């Protein structure tokens, strides 16, 4: 399966979220969300657009393993074939009976992986296995506001952007294609911003 980065549900000029879209099968998708909820919004879009889809929140818990030695730790856990997992691609794995989705993504601007646990009852077991595998590499728990993410210019929803921010203010112009034939939510609002210009822009110091 493959992943793509989204600006996340731009509505009336505002960013509601900045998720990663995972494609698990031809018609099976996950939105890996930032620090906000879009479940009811997505359900409302589906109903009002007449889409024949089922939208639900799965029993999935994400955990990230990031850093220059993350691949060596992943090899200890999953074997050598994990080295072949390309950036923004995913695979299904079983780790001693624990069902997982592993993607070559992360929130650190470093080599890293996201591990999606598909059975919440196995959370402690998974965590301990990862910490044991990473002990010789000095593995430590971290969080989304680590300095590596900030230095890499990776934005965190709520910390760096919110519902009052538009993509052009964040320098996300490269992710917006206003010339595409397909319509999408927020397209007209984004066209207007593009024509009028912005009054502020976020920069890193």
What is each PLM-predicted segment?
Residues 22-205:
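Conserved, structured C-terminal
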Residues 1-11:
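Single conserved hydrophobic/aromatic residue that forms the stacking wall/gate
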Residues 12-13, 96:
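Short loop/turn motifs at secondary-structure junctions and domain boundaries
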Residues 13-19:
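Gly/Ser-rich phosphate-binding catalytic loop and adjacent alpha/beta segment
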């Amino acid at each position: 399966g493959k992943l793509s980065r989204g600006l996340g549900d731009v509505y009336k000029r505002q960013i509601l979220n900045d998720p990663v879209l995972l494609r698990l099968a031809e018609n099976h998708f996950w939105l890996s969300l930032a620090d906000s909820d879009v479940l009811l919004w997505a359900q409302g879009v589906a109903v009002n657009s007449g889409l024949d889809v089922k939208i639900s929140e799965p029993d999935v818990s994400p955990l990230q393993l990031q850093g220059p030695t993350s691949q060596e730790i992943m090899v200890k856990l999953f074997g050598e074939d994990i080295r072949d997992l390309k950036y923004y691609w995913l695979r299904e794995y079983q780790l001693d009976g624990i069902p997982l989705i592993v993607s070559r993504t992360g929130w650190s601007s470093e080599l890293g992986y996201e591990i999606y646990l598909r059975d919440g009852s196995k959370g402690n077991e998974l965590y301990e296995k990862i910490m044991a595998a990473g002990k010789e590499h000095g593995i430590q728990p971290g969080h989304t506001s680590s300095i590596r993410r900030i230095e890499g210019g990776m934005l965190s929803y709520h910390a760096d952007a919110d519902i009052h921010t538009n993509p052009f203010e964040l320098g996300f112009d490269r992710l917006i294609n206003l010339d595409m034939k397909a319509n999408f939510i927020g397209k007209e609002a984004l066209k207007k911003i593009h024509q009028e210009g912005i009054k502020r822009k976020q920069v890193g110091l």
